[in-house]
Amino acid sequence: MDTQRFQSQFHWHLSFKFSGAIAACLSLSLVGTGLANADDSLPSSNYAPPAGGTFFLLADSSFSSSEESKVRLEAPGRDYRRYQMEEYGGVDVRLYRIPDPMAFLRQQKNLHRIVVQPQYLGDGLNNTLTWLWDNWYGKSRRVMQRTFSSQSRQNVTQALPELQLGNAIIKPSRYVQNNQFSPLKKYPLVEQFRYPLWQAKPVEPQQGVKLEGASSNFISPQPGNIYIPLGQQEPGLYLVEAMVGGYRATTVVFVSDTVALSKVSGKELLVWTAGKKQGEAKPGSEILWTDGLGVMTRGVTDDSGTLQLQHISPERSYILGKDAEGGVFVSENFFYESEIYNTRLYIFTDRPLYRAGDRVDVKVMGREFHDPLHSSPIVSAPAKLSVLDANGSLLQTVDVTLDARNGGQGSFRLPENAVAGGYELRLAYRNQVYSSSFRVANYIKPHFEIGLALDKKEFKTGEAVSGKLQLLYPDGEPVKNARVQLSLRAQQLSMVGNDLRYAGRFPVSLEGSETVSDASGHVALNLPAADKPSRYLLTVSASDGAAYRVTTTKEILIERGLAHYSLSTAAQYSNSGESVVFRYAALESSKQVPVTYEWLRLEDRTSHSGDLPSGGKSFTVNFDKPGNYNLTLRDKDGLILAGLSHAVSGKGSMSHTGTVDIVADKTLYQPGETAKMLITFPEPIDEALLTLERDRVEQQSLLSHPANWLTLQRLNDTQYEARVPVSNSFAPNITFSVLYTRNGQYSFQNAGIKVAVPQLDIRVKTDKTHYQPGELVNVELTSSLKGKPVSAQLTVGVVDEMIYALQPEIAPNIGKFFYPLGRNNVRTSSSLSFISYDQALSSEPVAPGATNRSERRVKMLERPRREEVDTAAWMPSLTTDKQGKAYFTFLMPDSLTRWRITARGMNGDGLVGQGRAYLRSEKNLYMKWSMPTVYRVGDKPSAGLFIFSQQDNEPVALVTKFAGAEMRQTLTLHKGANYISLAQNIQQSGLLSAELQQNGQVQDSISTKLSFVDNSWPVEQQKNVMLGGGDNALMLPEQASNIRLQSSETPQEIFRNNLDALVDEPWGGVINTGSRLIPLSLAWRSLADHQSAAANDIRQMIQDNRLRLMQLAGPGARFTWWGEDGNGDAFLTAWAWYADWQASQALGVTQQPEYWQHMLDSYAEQADNMPLLHRALVLAWAQEMNLPCKTLLKGLDEAIARRGTKTEDFSEEDTRDINDSLILDTPESPLADAVANVLTMTLLKKAQLKSTVMPQVQQYAWDKAVNSNQPLAHTVVLLNSGGDATQAAAILSGLTAEQSTIERALAMNWLAKYMATMPSVVLPAPAGAWAKHKLTGGGEYWRWVGQGVPDILSFGDELSPQNVQVRWREAAKTAQQSNIPVTVERQLYRLIPGEEEMSFTLQPVTSNEIDSDALYLDEITLTSEQDAVLRYGQVEVPLPPGADVERTTWGISVNKPNAGKQQGQLLEKARNEMGELAYMVPVKELTGTVTFRHLLRFSQKGQFVLPPARYVRSYAPAQQSVAAGSEWTGMQVK
């Protein structure tokens, strides 16, 4: 029995609350009907209203009245959310018509997402009544069952089976999913229906759409992604409402037989209304132009269907339209200004790519533009050039003066530790900032060389390129079994506008891209032939098992220097059957001449060729079929000499579907000429909109009714010819645009009409094309305008061509920069592409989901390697004379390569031009040293050099001279690199020279100075002596070296001497780097001329050290001692920030006040655990930096008061060495606390605060500081009590190179105010071999350059007595040193390659013999024999000449001997700094045993003497420990 068919339908009109009340009443009524014998309990219904789920509803196009309207619904069809929606059974759709569409659209804030508030009802009473009815019916039947006995019921049902109850009363209720939203009463309802969601056919991609390689198959049809048909509707605006459960979305559907095509520019909007099906003009449409907030202007289209509205265009605007039939359309327009006329500054550098430490030359040229063609000189004014590195950090600022005629120029030097990446130049000029860029690449010195020797000097097209690669270590030994990877890219020489250019780089497939070098280090090279003139770029990446690969790029030119021809015709298109004359001419004299022509029809690939007459200049071709043709000229070898494209019109011509082809008859027009444009449509077209555009729509016309600015001729059904007279206002270019619509689609095409702009013709000519290194190159520059000479300002650079292979030119062509082809400022759009959408959300509020983002990693390229000289010449300002001539010369650098000369120029009228030329530096025989220049006394190096030969088996003579001895060697060289061992016995300092002779003529010569230093660790020493006229005894140690004299007569000279010594301190930790920055800043302030060469050097050193500090910074701008991992130290952080502040103040680099707050943030976190001296120093720096620190000072004063005085303070006697560091060695000693007390008193006095420390404690601290031998204590006392230059000089005289750099730097900085500016005291030249040098901070000194050690100093008798400081370097074994309980052990292991790449087995080295071809592991073990932690130390490890530490250990794993098949241990990151013949490892804390491991290579053969490795306390240098025994004090490298 079907109980549900009797249900009432009135529940559709009841709210959810009301239905609940009725259910409660009915339940109560059933309880009271006397059903006492029945089971009154009501079973659960297991019913829940369908929740639904989110989905998207969108209308992705508009529709005409003859089309079926539809909307798209996208629901999740592949996850759990589908099951939440399936039980609803589909999607409820309602379609409404909007009575007043224009008012409705104007009220919307976002036309893409229409907002109409819903009327939410909920689930309703229907399903409640269903359950109640079924439940009551079941219970009533049970009551009736109990009324009769079981036997009676059985008898009745047997007689009348239709009375059997069966499963009717236990069958679950059937529920109906009701629409939970009421219809919108405001809008007429057109129709409503429920559409099957999961059963409907999903949207499929268009036929043939397939993405090759897509693993997710994301374009396959997905359930739930469907179109919902709405039927054909009358023109108007319709609202669609879609509902699933409690989720609802709305969108609008535009129905119109009219399309609005719009063109928006800066202050104007052009609208053309056309028929959607046929594309005819449709007048009488009402148009509103709105920015989404309000209507900016409005109008009605005229008889041609066009309307022009004037208003400033916002970035985004909308067109709301309603045609005469009631159809509604919307168009969205985007506009951005792409052409602005103002000051243009052309900023470029001498080359696009640099290495760290290189000099960068910058040139600035500028004009003030008023329109595309007319400009005036810029205003002469000062400007500031800022340099930002790849991290965005400001490196330096350079003052540049811009001149109206000559522009400006400047230069700067990159820091030696500059990071790799893109750098930005920002020029601040007259309240505007202009930008340019260049790149920096880091280069690691390769541990072997890769040479390329080709079998032929010249290769032609069609010939395979063959040769060999040669891999050699610096000592000439071949790199055996090296893994070599080859990568080849080709750049074809192509004709573009009769200009020979290299096209894009395309990879070339190689059969053997990976190979292995043979026993002689050779790799056979066989590259495929090039079918066209090309430039091959061969990248070679080789590895001998080291942690990094040696990578180099070689250039191979195919048919280099080949002359080319120009090929031209009167028009770029013609009619089919018409005879076309093509003319050709050689651009340069050459033996190659064209003998045949060939054309290729692109549509069907048919071709034809013909012979050219001997000595002819033209040929004629008759094209029978319309289409697009490519014509080429070839020589007798089939080589392409010229090429041209040509279009042919005729019946049957048509463009590709959806496109319009426009071909101009010429690429360049002169004013007064007529531009002919061939227009080809994809189908017969009768109407289109033609416009001329640039900054606005300059002209407009219909295809059916041509305007007076053009003439039109219809050639056939699909082709028209437009003729446009060219006026002066068209220059430099204007856009000719064609726009049409048909069958609900629209298409437009732009074609440029380029008009000639006068440009300088700059020619570069050298007296020859090939030079030898060292030769004088004479360059002639010519500037002309329209064939007549003209004077111009030129900038010329000569750069290694391989730079452009690594990094193409960044600066644009100067002509394209100042007179670029104007960008079209008109944006075209249509109402066909407007999309409205909505996302269905639940009517109940839900918490927002979490955002999921993924990080994109950045991949870095392998580092390349270059030659030493990259810019051979840079002429920033040359002026050609009235004849347009200018000349300059330069010496060809000592490198073999191809050079590019680039000349850029501008004349007084602002016309510009650019020219380019090439030349080569070549030499048949070329030598290069392959040995270090610094050795130790006792070393016996095996000297050698490389000879690069372009010849094969030619006899030569090598003549070498050293220490008065001459040696001659007769050699026979093979082609490529030849390593030659020299016969000289070199064991002392001197000049080594070599000459290479052939047939009695010197082919090449080189020389280098060799130095032999002491074979012990050096120690810097100094003393002050009084010198007078006559002879003065020096009394220096016999082994003294680097002897120098400098005056210390005045406090100013003492100050300069200390400043210079501090700047020369080695190593790069936070302490030393900051300690160099402060004296450098003092030196900068003392300079009178900040543009001098000395100022440039100091500025460069400041930049280097500032960048080093930046690189040492850790997270949160906190610093550790040497940039190691760990939490930042507040004291070191403050020292780094203070040093950076000093440098910034000196150079004028401004920062916001909160920038320096990092310093106090770190202090606030750690102050309670810091020594009092460190706290006082940090606050002294903060006070000097004008940071807020009064509260912190009070806290420090209270801490000192709490300490008071202790018994040990009085009992402890200050016996410390004067060279020991109070700040870093014993910062918690009683003396350090006393110094902190005195310094705090000074700070409180400056801050006008009172101390809480007891007077007797202050007096004790004062006495202890005064009686100390520490320079820091004396400096603090002087700051508190005041003093003069004499007292300051006394403190400065006690500073030595053995003392801590931070204490010396602080003393100099705090005592600098006592140093009045005085001229340097001139120390006369002593008799003998003394050379004069400049001090960093000003002044001069004399250095001994003679042999041995001078005994006496002789001056003229007129010299009055003068204080002089003598500085020298002596061996550590002769200086006073104190040992500390630390054991230093050194062990070398040879790395034996394992089965896997980058895995090695360690083989202990038991003798002093070293293989120069092998890789070694240097293991240093330190063992402290005391319980106390030794802080701030360093291990100094000697190296023989030519040895080097590998920069990285990444990926290398090593196994100890007898480790079996255990997994290798990865090497830790190398942490070292290189010194002279040694490397240093910082050791922040030493307790127990610590081991350091580094990879070493030994390149120089010979017998070498080494001092033992040692451990030194960094800030107590007299405390050290050396390795015991004689092991590793000598090495023999073979």
UniProtKB/Swiss-Prot annotation:
Pfam families: A2M, A2M_BRD, MG2. Residues 1-38 form the signal peptide. PANTHER family: ALPHA-2-MACROGLOBULIN HOMOLOG (PTHR40094), UBIQUITIN DOMAIN-CONTAINING PROTEIN (PTHR40094:SF1). This is Alpha-2-macroglobulin homolog. It comes from Escherichia coli O157:H7. Belongs to the protease inhibitor I39 (alpha-2-macroglobulin) family. Bacterial alpha-2-macroglobulin subfamily. One of its GO terms (molecular function) is endopeptidase inhibitor activity. The keyword Signal applies. Keywords: Signal.
